[in-house]
């Protein structure tokens, strides 16, 4: 029998999620299990911690007699998870701010399923069997900011998403195409998680992300063979790990000059063209682990804010004295606090100590035994 989360905890987590909207913990930690921690500082995540935050008074206890059978209702939170529901329940209080319907058997969202829920802030539909959504199903949800609809059977991104939406998590579905206009009017959106879908590069129509000002985008565990070139240029975080990307060409990153974090681990990257990384002047963290690189990528010393580089589990055989640090002092604005090189065929005893002259501490350098 699944453990039921206390309702006071759900309400608390809803309130806490405002400070760091992209870092999932506890109840919100549904799916991100690849081991890459989210940026946890406001500047790095690009998160706006003031806009869209509901008044804390809205979480004042209410005593509405409306509560669906079998559900738990308190503090404007309606929890109906793990009940084997076949449809969205009726008799949901109109002042509900969080509706939890995860881990059920819901296969369809109908036109009036959310009628009257104009105060709903977060809707959790993770791990159902949803394959059909009426084009007006979300119309009543004028204040919805968080929609979690991952681990369902969707073959397309739902139409007519609420214009108030800030965060969409739709990973682990069956989506193959992202058509132009599907995100039209979503000016408040800053986070989309759509990994775990069978998306190829050809599945993104030109202009698919037009109008979006995203800070965070994850398209991991898909079928990408290259870095998409038409993503929002406002991105601070881009995660494309666990794909089939083979190379980074000169202009692949041209649009993404505002990136703080770039995740490209677990791909098939053999080549990074010289100058490719020069378009990322604000980059702080770079994940290139579990690829097929034979050398340290060129251009790392020119990234003045870069602090973390994951290069473990590649085919790197040599590390040069100037591969990480610029020549001379005072050029780099932030020292490295993490460089991983373990599981590479590098004779670590041949690496000169001066190679890591711009690292905060020797413990930040991770070498390890290489096993062929």
From Swiss-Prot:
GO (cellular component) term, any one: extracellular space
Endpoints of the signal sequence: 1-19
PROSITE patterns in UniProt: LRR
Ranges for the LRR repeats: 86-106, 107-130, 131-154, 155-175, 176-199, 200-224, 225-245, 246-269, 270-293, 294-316, 317-346, 347-372
InterPro entries the record matches: Leu-rich_rpt (IPR001611), Leu-rich_rpt_typical-subtyp (IPR003591), LRR_dom_sf (IPR032675), LRRNT (IPR000372), SLRP (IPR050333), SLRP_I_decor/aspor/byglycan (IPR016352)
Annotated glycan sites: 45, 51, 274, 315
Entry-linked SMART domains: LRR_BAC, LRR_TYP, LRRNT
Propeptide: 20-40
Keywords (A to Z) from UniProt: Disulfide bond, Extracellular matrix, Glycoprotein, Leucine-rich repeat, Proteoglycan, Repeat, Secreted, Signal
Modification after translation: The two attached glycosaminoglycan chains can be either chondroitin sulfate or dermatan sulfate.
Source species, domain of life: Eukaryota
Subcellular location: Secreted, Extracellular space, Extracellular matrix
Disulfide cysteine pairs (residue numbers): 67-73, 71-80, 325-358
Protein purpose: May be involved in collagen fiber assembly.
Family to which the UniProt record says this protein belongs: Belongs to the small leucine-rich proteoglycan (SLRP) family. SLRP class I subfamily.
Subunit comment: Homodimer. Forms a ternary complex with MFAP2 and ELN.
Record protein name field: Biglycan
Taxonomic placement: Eukaryota, Metazoa, Chordata, Craniata, Vertebrata
